[in-house]
Each structure stands twice: as structure tokens, then as C-alpha cells.
Amino acid sequence: MLTHDTIERNQGLMIVLILLVIAIGGLVEIVPLPFMKSMTEPVAGLEPYTPLQLTGRDVYIREGCYGCHSQMVRPFRAEVERYGRYSVAGEFVYDHPFQWGSKRTGPDLHRVGGRYSDEWHRLHLVNPRNLVPESNMPGYPWLAKAAANAEDIETKMRALRLVGVPYKDQQIAEARGELKDRTEMDALIAYLQVLGTAIKQKQ
């Protein structure tokens, strides 16, 4: 019979047993994930981003907003009380790549959709200190003058369709029209206003 002392004295045996434990742990934790519907299917009510929201998401990524804002409310009481219902995997099925983030210089944004008006976001993006005096977020006034980029929107939507986002041909065909005469600020606000709205929240 193997004793603890025997295992510690035999390095080869100890390595084999460590690898065996890691392998079993990996199988138990990882293998079931693809078969769990809650991890792979969208939550009820989740819609793909509209062309305007998708363009706003690109602006969000380009400007590095993920460096200071996360988009994942963790299942802790303090977070739920501050931000709203905790995030679930089915809300991110159409996010390629997801924007969970790992740093919060600013607040989490996953439940910001519908919390403030479009005008509030517009004022905040131009100069955050107009609304939150202690904010260290930079302003983004140029977004109000930059036209929303419609050049490659159809290509983006087709690429997303290849990875499972259910865009229809008609949506792709009408995408440029939705971006006509819209600014990057319009697009970013549209994106922020849809974040976390697929699941109804109890406030």
C-alpha cells in the first residue's frame, strides 16, 4: 500500500500522481462545458448588435475603453447591489471577442444600458467632469464630429455570421443605410445603451 512517505520519497511516482489528479480535475471541469446549454445558447431576448451598435462596439475597442471598464458583473452581493443582476454566459454568445475586461479604473458597464439618457452619455463623453467632477476619464469630443464608418460594415456582419451570429441577408444589405449621417458618438452611445438589457433587471 502506498503511504504518503513513500510517494514523497519517489519523485517519479509523485509526478505521475500529480499529473493524474490534474487530468481528472481538467476532465471534470472542462469536458462538460460544451454540453451545457446555459454556456452555449443565448439568453431569451438576446439580439445581435444592430449595425450602429456594432460600429459603436468597434469605437469602444479602438479607444481602449476596456482598459478601464469591465463588462462583467460578478455574482457577489456588493457588485449586484451596485451594478445590477450578475452577468451570465448566455449574454455574451454574440460577442466576438467578449469585453469582460479585468481592470476597473472606472465602473463596470455591463448593466449601463438604459440607466442614463442618450444626452447624459453625450455630455459625459465630451467631458466627463461636467457630470462627475472627480472622474479621471478622458473626454472624447472628436467622436461627435467623426462620421460612423460604413465602409466595411457588411464585411464585419458576414464575418460574424460565420461564427454563429444570426444576421439575415436583409439586415446586412440595409446596414450602410442605418449608418448614414450618424457619428461615432451616436454609434458608441447606441452600443452603451444596449449593454446588459437582454435580461430584465430587478432594481
Question: What is each residue range found by the language model?
Answer:
Residues 37-61, 73-80, 105, 175-178, ...:
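Electrostatic cytochrome c docking/interface patches
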Residues 31-38, 63-67, 72, 76, ...:
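A generic secondary-structure signal for well-formed alpha-helical elements
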Residues 68, 134-139, 199-203:
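Surface-exposed patches in mature extracellular/periplasmic domains of secreted proteins
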